[in-house]
From Swiss-Prot:
Record flagged with keyword RNA-binding: yes
Protein's job: Inhibits post-transcriptional processing of cellular pre-mRNA, by binding and inhibiting two cellular proteins that are required for the 3'-end processing of cellular pre-mRNAs: the 30 kDa cleavage and polyadenylation specificity factor/CPSF4 and the poly(A)-binding protein 2/PABPN1. In turn, unprocessed 3' end pre-mRNAs accumulate in the host nucleus and are no longer exported to the cytoplasm. Cellular protein synthesis is thereby shut off very early after virus infection.
Protein name: Non-structural protein 1
Positions occupied by motif Nuclear export signal: 137-146
Gene3D superfamilies noted in UniProt: Influenza virus non-structural protein, effector domain, S15/NS1, RNA-binding
InterPro entries: NS1, NS1A, NS1A_effect_dom-like_sf, uS15_NS1_RNA-bd_sf
Assigned protein family: Belongs to the influenza A viruses NS1 family.
Amino acid sequence: MDPNTVSSFQVDCFLWHVRKRVADQELGDAPFLDRLRRDQKSLRGRGSTLGLDIKTATRAGKQIVERILKEESDEALKMTMASVPASRYLTDMTLEELSRDWSMLIPKQKVAGPLCIRMDQAIMDKNIILKANFSVIFDRLETLILLRAFTEEGAIVGEISPLPSLPGHTAEDVKNAVGVLIGGLEWNDNTVRVSETLQRFAWRSSNENGRPPLTPKQKREMAGTIRSEV
């Protein structure tokens, strides 16, 4: 196993532990708590994939961070922070919409690279909007936290989420997954539109319905999604 993969996991575990302590002291806002929950799932998936114990990794990560901090001068730390571009966290969904449990009458699921697409194929003839919580950097989507499809009545009928075992995805991965989700929902004569925030940062071009036109590849994936069982 690559030692850098192990040390990266160890440091991520320790930093999550620090953030959890911050949350326990009620010092974190909604986006902070949102990322904390999502990262916990990601770490569990990575730990299972790597065969590493999270508690042991956390202790090792603490030693790595402490060693670095001892070697780091205050001036060097300031320069490093100043040179790192800041990302922004954008929220279409409320905390309740983000954390709400939902179920499907006719569940369909597809894994597209590092993303999991889920939708309820029982939904027909509905007006649906896609909302997402994500971070952006340089005016481009950086990390998708969660995307969900809502009916006008507020019911959740679809979702795109990162796979905990495959961390890391690109804006293009998200764009392709959105195309597959839209295609699957439109198959049953639903009308789908995308939130303005997601439309602005997830892609640059869209049609008059507020969503990107499907590529031939996305249409093929859409057809495969309709036929695939969970």
